[in-house]
């Protein structure tokens, strides 16, 4: 019942942009949250620039997450350490708790650590998809203690969040630390397969897992062409 409510509440009933990741292991479809507009628009921009095409899932940790978006991974040699390839700007954190949190299937932005990045601004390109594990009350209480220290008591695991972490799974210790800006709506079996793959000492899969192509399949926020531009498009089509 909780899962149905999470997906059908007014917060998630709005039309959302969607992106399809075609990977060597199967397809993953992602819906982007309107509540994180800066991250949503940036992800759409990076996808539109085709920067994700041919990049690896360069960091994979079982029962935790799978990460991609390192711009240096496109032509990386086997065994090379990855994780530093990024664009030259960052995005202001958009924490939206308790609505958006690190449940299984959440898509979040990677970033530099707190010492170099105390505002917890997101990197512009690298992202991860949460797998995580299921938690019990005792372990969630310990996570809450840690979050209280890291966030000066501003991040609280609500009963609704706790229920999801206990029944579905996720990574609650990342809440309030990294911006969640989307969710996987198709292809969780692909994520499960990737997160179980054998990795090297750098957490890179021993067999390359690659995003073949990233495509915007739905974007209700794309600007509508002006009438004159539509006519020009029609003329071009007629000339062909």
Predicted regions and their residues:
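Cyclophilin-like peptidyl-prolyl cis-trans isomerases
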Residues: 11-240
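Bacterial N-terminal signal peptides
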Residues: 1-10
């Amino acid at each position: 019942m909780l899962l149905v409510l999470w997906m059908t509440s007014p917060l998630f009933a709005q039309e959302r942009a969607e992106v399809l990741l075609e990977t060597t292991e199967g397809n993953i479809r992602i819906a982007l949250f309107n509540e994180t507009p800066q991250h949503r628009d940036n992800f759409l921009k990076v996808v539109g620039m085709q920067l994700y095409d041919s990049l690896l899932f360069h960091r994979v940790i079982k029962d935790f997450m799978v990460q991609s978006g390192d711009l240096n991974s496109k032509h990386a040699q086997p065994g090379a350490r990855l994780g530093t390839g990024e664009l030259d700007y960052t995005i202001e954190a958009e924490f939206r708790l308790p609505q958006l949190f690190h449940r299984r299937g959440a898509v979040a932005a990677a970033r530099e650590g707190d010492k170099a990045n105390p505002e917890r601004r997101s990197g512009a390109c690298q992202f991860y998809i949460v797998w995580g594990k299921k938690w019990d009350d005792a372990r969630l209480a310990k996570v809450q203690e840690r979050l209280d220290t890291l966030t000066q008591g501003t991040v609280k695991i609500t009963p609704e969040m706790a229920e999801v972490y206990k029944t579905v799974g996720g990574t609650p210790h990342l809440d309030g630390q990294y911006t969640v800006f989307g969710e996987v709506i198709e292809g969780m079996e692909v994520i499960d397969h990737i997160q179980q793959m054998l990795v090297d000492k750098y957490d890179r899969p021993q067999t390359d897992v690659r995003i073949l192509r990233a495509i915007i399949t739905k974007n209700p926020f794309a600007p509508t062409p002006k009438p004159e531009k539509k006519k020009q498009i029609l003329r071009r089509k007629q000339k062909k």
